[in-house]
Amino acid sequence: MVTYTPPAEAQDLPTKLKVLYFSNEFPTDDLSTLLRRLHSHSKHSSHPILARFLSEATRVLRNEVSQLRMELGQLVPAFESVTTLAGETKLRKGPLAQSIDGVLLCVLQLGMYIGYASHPLWFFLHCELYPEDQATETNSVLTGLGVGILVSTAVSVSTSLDDAVTAGVEVLRIAFRLGVFVANVSHNLEDVDAEASDSWAYVVHGMTVDEAQKELDDIQAKERTPSASKIFVSAISETSVTVSGPPSRLKALFRNYASFRDRKFAHLPVYGGLCHAAHIYAREDAQAVVRAPSLPARYKPVVPVMSTSSGQPFLASSAAELFEQVIFEVLTKQIVWDNVIRGVAERVAKTDVHDVNIKVFRHSLPAQQLSTALTSAMTDLPVDADDLLAWVGTDVDHGQYSPGSSMQSKIAIVGMSCRMPGGATDTEKFWDLLEAGLDVHRRIPADRFDVDSHHDPTGKRMNTSHTAYGCFIDEPGLFDAPFFNMSPREAEQTDPMQRLAIVTAYEALERAGYVANRTPATNLNRIGTWYGQASDDYREVNTGQEISTYFIPGGCRAFGPGRINYFFKFAGPSFNCDTACSSSLATIQAACTALWAGDVDTVVAGGLNVLTNSDAFAGLCNGHFLTKTPNACKTWDCTADGYCRADGVGSIVMKRLDDALADNDNILGVIPAAATNHSANAVSITHPHAGHQSDLYRQVMARAGIDPLDVSYVEFHGTGTQAGDAEEMESITNVFAPIKGKRRTSKQPLHIGAVKANVGHGEAAAGVTALIKVLLMLQKGAIPPHVGIKTSINPGFPKDMERRNLHIPFETTAWSRTSEKKRIAVVNNFSAAGGNTTLVLEEGPVRDRLGSDPRPSHVFTVSAKSKISLKGNLQRLIAYLEKNEDVSMADLAYSLTARRYHHNHRVAATATDTSSLKQQLISKLDGVDSMKPMPTTGAPPVAFVFTGQGAADKSMNLQLYHHSPFFRSQLESLDRLGQQHGFPSFLPAVDGSYPKDHAWPPVITQVAHTSVEIALARYWETLGIKPEVVAGHSLGEYAAFVIAGVLSASDAIFLVGSRAQMLESLCTAGTHKMMAVKASRCEIEDAIKDLPYDLACVNGPKETVLSGTTEQMEAVSVPLKEKGYRVIFLDVPFAFHSAQTDPILDLFEETARKSVIFRPPTLPIVSPLLGRVVFDEKSLNAEYLRRATRGTVDFLSAMQNAQETSIVDKDTVWVEVGPHPVCVAFIKASFDPAPVTVGSFRRGEDNWTTLAAGLGQLHTAGLPVRWGEFHRPFEASLRLLDLPTYSWNEKNYWIQYRGDWALTKGNTFYDAEKGINRQAAAAPVSSLSTTTVQQIIEENFSGSSGKVVMQSDLMQPDLLAAAHGHKMNNCGVVTSSIHGDIVYTLGEYLYKKLIPMAKTVHANITDLKVTKGLVAQSNTKVPQYFRVTATTADIHAGAADFVWENVANDGTVSEPFATCRVVYGDADHWLSSWSPLAHLVQGRIETLERLAAEGIANRFSHKMAYTLFGNNLVEYADKYRGMQAVVMHEFEAFADVTLKHVSGGGSYTVPPYFIDSVAHLAGFIMNVSDASDTANTFCVTPGWDSMRFARPLVPGQRYRSYVKMIPTDDDPSVYLGDVYVFQDKVIMGMVGGIQFRRYPRILMNRFFAAPDSSIAKSYAAAGGAGPAVSAPAPAPPVSPPKPAVVEAALQANPSASTPASTPAPAAVTAAPAVNSDSTSGKALVLIANEAGLEQSDLTDDAAFANLGVDSLMSLVIAEKFREELGIVVAGSLFLEYPTIGALRSWLEEYYS
């Protein structure tokens, strides 16, 4: 016992030694509670340093996680604070357990230390650790164990608590990397289930280190344990030792040997891998973990850190050196805690210490041992201890929270998309109209409301708009409903704002290169949506007319962003905000605030406005908001009198700038600050206030840290109102262009602009519209011209703009990026409700490419959700390549693969240059229709097959080793294992150091082969390609066993190397050979009779390998060659699977039995030795390896057994893992059809080229390739390209506002007007009246524009007779020729009204589209009205548009059913243009004449022609029967026509029967030709491209018509042709591009039934009878309630309503038996027959869309249901019940 006596001179100066002990274990308290309380304290005003530490720790950990390969990174859930990870139990038991626990221990101990040292009572702690004079030795020491000693280094190098934050997060980074590194190395020693809690260390009590070491040496020598797998002593104390090693070997040690089993022992909670292992790790490993720390040079060790091995302080001169020494000790040195105790005691003895204070994080055994030892060694020395965790238990004063600044990070905008007025369907078109200085206002389009009835410039009519103008998106109803999993019904009822929001969100994300969960910032849990919207027009007006299923989810605002979150699976918040005109920018500011606060990491934000409600126009007019003149906003004009309303939809994607840079995003612009305030002191709520606006600018500029004079552009709110413009100009000039005080220099010009002058005021979308404009300005380097000043500038604006250096750009002005200063802009957006929002925007940083991409070949992918879109995407990419021939192929591949969503219709191409790529894409475009989409059942299974020896060059140059850090680290780790086992390094054999024919000893060749395959398999797994079954060929089995978990990588390398050494020492190279024979086993036996040989391998039906002595093989080869079999001698030194290996078998088996551990396989293994699939652990052992060395490799039988047991099938994708694809040929030969096979490497080909081709195949097969991992090594050198966006398969989903109820609304104002209108209806507007144009009910003419509306009653006798003269299905049908006469009549009337001097009008009827037949009703006593509207904006443009609508008897107008355009022309010009064609057509007519004479073509008389026509489709009245004779061959014919004299029968401009007579030859061909299936189909025309006659059609005159109908490429059921009409061998008329579509004859009743008949009504009740000329498009399923017709059927048949007693089964893979007597059974048989399916195809999970049941087939089957089963259903039945199972269940429920 040493008695401690303080030195006499020290009595007056008591000195205390402070010892801080950092444990390697968590305290026994609940860790989550401790960290939660630590986090809570960090919010207190007294702990700003703690708050910064936790914030920085979170940031650093996120950064480290982002560097992990994807399969590991995705294990870490999204986290707002590192402290929350303590509760992630699954994470802390998984592969990253040691890394995460190391981080949490760092956070806990450093956080508690910082918090303790910051506390008012103990603030001096940290200062006391350090001497005031750095030359003086400190009276403090730092100790610790494991990660704890690493934590202590942060304290050692920090002279302040602020320094401790910086050093602490660096230590946290190292701790995380240490855990990952140790886990990776340990994984090669033993692949342990991370959740199995198998320990890598046991403590043994009562055993000395010498005893333990002797026992271990003896045991492991006897077992021949490979050196890398040996158990070793890792820690020593006086009473115990700790032994460490692979868990399975530790278990065996304590199970099998009494010297350990019989002592007291316990396993330690060490689950992450091995440390303190000098035989495993080296100095360079420590350097790899530490790398280059980012600490400044001033960080140096000040407080000594005691080595846990030597007990002496580490001697380091810098922080980096200290970190490296500590990590090296943790990895390689034994823990000898007694040495630490001794070292501290020595320090006490050497210094003038009066007492010792030990600081601990809760009391622990090592700290207690230290205290006890000091007390025992030195009597009378006071030793006390403080708990640094005690303070965290104190209550937090919630009144003194100080959350700190949330405005530290700038916000990057990384993607944008828009739909703007003026046809701006993308940002490029938007820029084009801005740059061109366009004002895109126009009259309110008809799809919104009838502007004429809802507009009154006098303002006298109630509820009308004073203006008829606005700025509008073209066809806002266009939408790709199936893409977004919406049915047509849901799409139609969903607000177009919501639809365009999700479309532009997708496009913005696509342009941002967004891929879900690719990086921490794109974690789905951390993404939210924010959209501004200020109206609900579509819900209030359009869908409100007939409220249905989707009225609420389709119309309520919250569902817009909610739908985006739901579709993309974003789990962050979704907000819809309304602040009136500032909605979008205020919402974007709110989204920025969420980013600044850390609530989310990625944001999709924007604004929405689509105008359909006339009320808003009326209300704004009455509130004096809107301009009365036809223009967009007259911003800054002296006559500005209000704004012009506008549509607008814009979406942007935002991230924090550091996240965007880390994600390698394109940064379109950066937001340093944004803010909102309110004009509280304005004279009225809607009036702006310059003072408050100026305050806002100063606030936001201060927040951004930017001088207002450095702003070079301001985007005004600029609505074009006198008050608003003047106030905003005043506020802007006061702050950004002042005349007093500091002013702008000549080099600081300020330009201003306002986008509303171009596209109007988008209201809720105005802010995002302005923001996108400025983003485009930054992108294009230009400021577009301002077009708002129509007359002269607002006189209230400053007269000294020049002195202020303030400029309005009246032409495009350069605004280029310079190196001198940033371009900075301000965007304003104000609210009519008083809010002001301002956002500062600056250009993004310039980023340099780091490194280069050496890959010579790249893979390019294109995908879509439909074939139409796939074609469009391919076409867009081809067009892009044509415009950008010098595009970087590496960038293009990266952008198309790693930065895009991948859908189920896929193509992939591998190319080295744009020309080659373009040709491949063109080729693939041609084959899209024949491509099969990915299966809906998910990705196909993957099998890895590992190549045997002999496939590679003797020396390899693996490009993957040089350029893939992961692959290289794997190979180097495996190479080190080999060296630890005593084998030479194999790296020179694979790194290209030697020529490819340089031979190596077998031990190097075979270890290299196995190691390359293990590393390659793991590389495939990082790319997302994971096997479900493995197979190995010969030597390849060892790598297969590693991947299947049977052997550790260490054991496999040991076995392969040992076997090779045995071959070298016990066998003679070159005495035996192996010979491949292109013949079957039986053929070989027949050919060589009794000659001796060994059957080495049976690889395929015709692939066999023999082995034997050299003499035997040469002898055997002779008869085989004589038989014509191909023979190849393999270049291998030893003949495996032959008698040559006999000398090594016993020794090898014994070595395998004693030295390695076999574990149960985690994957099925296809065993070529056993010829079957192995699942159990008993089959794979040392004896198996012996037999595999000598026995036959029966690869063929193994493959056949795998197929028979369904382990693999035709869908299995095979990846050959090896140096050259050999086995895939055997696999293809074993399967019919051949499966998809992919090689990894190929001799003579760059690795990247082979991998690119293989990944393309795997991608198109449907596997989820992790493209980000593939590009990761080169990402710093790659850039995201701004490629064309998705090509939508759009249809117009729109509910038209009908009538004028928005005006009347129950008021009495319009009662009198209605009476006047009724009187006016009785008195026609015009005297014009013909049979087809019976009454002009409205006409308006203004200058050169005009509108004429006619209404006719189909029941009028002459018109009804004309319809009945064209009977189909016994119904009178208005033929296209009647439509033609209407157009000729109205077209001439309109033209002459506007150009009264015109004498002759020649009209070309173009683009006629009839979407639904107009069929005469059967009740002739009730009117059947239809209406045609003709309009022209400018008659001098030579065109007018026509629209047909049905009109109900109550005046309700239905949706248009036909449209066309008239183009006025010159008859003489037409004649001259046709003249060159006449002889060509005449030549065809002469050919038909000759064919008729030869009996090849058919000749029909007048009567025969019309009899056949009537029998097959159309029964024509006599006056229509103008064809006198017809000659026809297949789809080509001519007819001689004489137009009939008809007396009476009505008045016409061009009689319909004249038009029909010369044109219906096309219909005759399609419905009579023997080339058509007229028995089962009929053909009708939906219209034509052009119809014109240069001369009048005259009764009694003779004409000749000719036409040839040709099927279209896109749809073989649609035919096109040009009808030429001759008079005297001159072409005088033509019907160009007349179209006929073929339909099943069964649909005749559905298409052509009198609208008041019972059958038509039943179709209407079932969902509509479908259009006459087109059918609904397929769409995704919905689950609506039972159809109304079914309800009626059930009421009529009560027994049918009884539900089936057994519910329909769940989806199964096999088709259930069909009960053909049941209704459901009959229905399925009917479906199978109609669709040409087998009963086996009708599995419950089979989707009708995948079975080829398209919209047309749906109509046919629905008709069959009605006819054969008596079930009336809609054609949409298969959308509502999209699978066989769903339909079966429905039928059984309602019809069983």
From Swiss-Prot:
Gene3D superfamilies, per the entry: 3.30.70.3290, 3.40.47.10, ACP-like, Malonyl-Coenzyme A Acyl Carrier Protein, domain 2, Polyketide synthase dehydratase
Catalytic-site annotation from UniProt: 581, 717, 761, 1366, 1556
Pfam family, one: PP-binding
Pathway(s) of this molecule: Secondary metabolite biosynthesis
Location of the region described as N-terminal acylcarrier protein transacylase domain (SAT) in the Swiss-Prot/TrEMBL record: 28-272
Region (Product template (PT) domain) residue spans: 1330-1650
Modified residues (O-(pantetheine 4'-phosphoryl)serine): 1751
Boundaries of every PKS/mFAS DH domain copy: 1334-1645
Entry superkingdom: Eukaryota
GO BP term (any one): secondary metabolite biosynthetic process
Domain Carrier: 1717-1791
Record region (N-terminal hotdog fold): 1334-1469
GO molecular function: fatty acid synthase activity; phosphopantetheine binding
Region: Malonyl-CoA:ACP transacylase (MAT) domain, residue numbers: 944-1263
NCBIfam families: PT_fungal_PKS
Its job: Atrochrysone carboxylic acid synthase; part of the gene cluster that mediates the biosynthesis of the tetrahydroxanthone dimer secalonic acid D. The pathway begins with the synthesis of atrochrysone thioester by the polyketide synthase AacuL. The atrochrysone carboxyl ACP thioesterase AacuM then breaks the thioester bond and releases the atrochrysone carboxylic acid from AacuL. Atrochrysone carboxylic acid is decarboxylated by the decarboxylase AacuI, and oxidized by the anthrone oxygenase AacuG to yield emodin.
PANTHER family given in the database record: FATTY ACID SYNTHASE, SI:DKEY-61P9.11
Protein name per UniProt: Atrochrysone carboxylic acid synthase AacuL
Species assigned in the record: Aspergillus aculeatus (strain ATCC 16872 / CBS 172.66 / WB 5094)
